[in-house]
Amino acid sequence: MKVLLLALVVLLQGCAATYFHDAGPAPQPAAVTLESWPHRDLWTGVVFNGEKIGFTRRQVRAAVDAPGRWEIESEAVMRLQFLGVDKRIRLHAVDRVRPDLTLETFSYEHEIDGNRMRVRGNAGAAVLSYAVEAGGSAENKTLKIEKPLYPASALAFLPLMQGIKIGTRARHAVFHGETQAIAEAEQDVVAYESSPLFEGSAFKVATRLLGLETTTWIAVDGRPLLELGMRGAIVSALEDEARARHYLVEASLNKRDAMVEFSLLRAGPIEQPRRVSRMDIVLDDFPKAFAVDNDGCRRVSDRLECRIDRSAPLAQGDPQRYLAPTLAAPSVLGEIRDLANEINKGSTSNEQTIARLLAWMDANIAKEAVDAFTAADVLRARRAECQGHAYLFAAFARALGIPTRIVNGIAYSEPHGGFLYHTWNEAWIAGRGWQPVDATFGQALADATHVKLIEGESAAELVPLVNLVGRVRVASVSALARW
């Protein structure tokens, strides 16, 4: 544990280079296969922003009922504080692969705050078929396979199995279970290094997937000695099972809100933020690759300059596709459709409908930092954070014929003295266009401290936001007008 905390502190201070040294000529590891893989069961401890939050476990075994096939079982368990709530997360995956690590079948289960999502499927010669179940809803989907397809878990094995050598780059098509997307993973073998942060020497491998980069130091025998993600904010290192599982004790004693501390964009005070109708804001260190979905923003070098004006109409567009039910907002689900109609009895306009939905949610859905996969999860638990509120509002509104989309960005938090990442809605009002609505704050017209950055509700659509967290800073902000 001491090693992990030391690594995190050093890397966040920008001194990583002084802790890694060239280890001389790299050896050529012996050829290895899944059958000869030396480590069948590995545990790692996970640290986020200076606090131990969980562990991971990876097992490799021959498939009992399928000769010549192998199973990679992966598990990640985490516990952390967020906005005063004790959050528990468990990710479990079983990938069945061929001897060359290409994917054959898979079964994933994601559990957050008691809500579950399951993804199961198989990869054929040209098509990947899978089913997603969450909140009582299910979707069957297919994706086209154009080249050999690997599970994300195979990335830990591929460098060694394909002949690890400094200066080489490999590209693989990977199915990413958390986002249910096929994406290209790029792996560079960068160096052969030693470090006081781990024993011996190891190959430094940089992996890029879905715009995110992790760096792993892999020993000659295939063990992942150290791994860094989110620019060093997440650190994992090998531990024995007893030490890895001890995170439960440490997490129960941890009262720091590590997630808020890491993600908060500190800013000067904004008085009465929920009444701000026009605001200027400049964000520093904004990634050039991030496609901002906001007509009120413009790029100037590595800055994003935005004017949010609630008197100006939002961009127009075809709203009809935002009536369709989705896994996150299953507007055709009976319990959602029936309740929406009951809430809306007697309404004579879309504006009145929106007001009634917000009033009902304010009275019946508690505002707690509890995650959900679907609007049905929120309705049954009667509590949610901002994303869950946006899911439920979208499901209600779509069930009543109001095109509604889910958007993401930042909004000012008075208790925290800065901007937090936030999710809200935009509802289509005939003759006016898109209107920002925030069910968390009960706003039929969201205030101008809401800075929309990206639209979307699926995990795949939201991945780009991860590159902003802990990186972007507020250079200046000014509230120009209030209601």
Task: Mark where each language-model region is.
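C-terminal motif of bacterial Sec signal peptides marking the signal peptidase cleavage site
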Residues: 12-14
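Acidic/charged, solvent-exposed loop-and-adjacent secondary-structure segments enriched in E/D, K/R, S/T
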Residues: 132-153, 357
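Acidic low-complexity segments
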Residues: 295-383
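Hydrophobic/aromatic-rich core segments of domains that either
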Residues: 24, 201-204, 210-212, 221-223, ...
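Active-site nucleophilic cysteine motif
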Residues: 50, 353-357, 382-397
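Sec-dependent signal peptide recognition
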Residues: 1-7
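Generic recognition of flexible, low-complexity loop/linker segments
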Residues: 160, 190-193, 203-205, 213-215, ...
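Acidic, serine/threonine-rich low-complexity disordered tracts
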Residues: 16-125, 160-315, 459-483
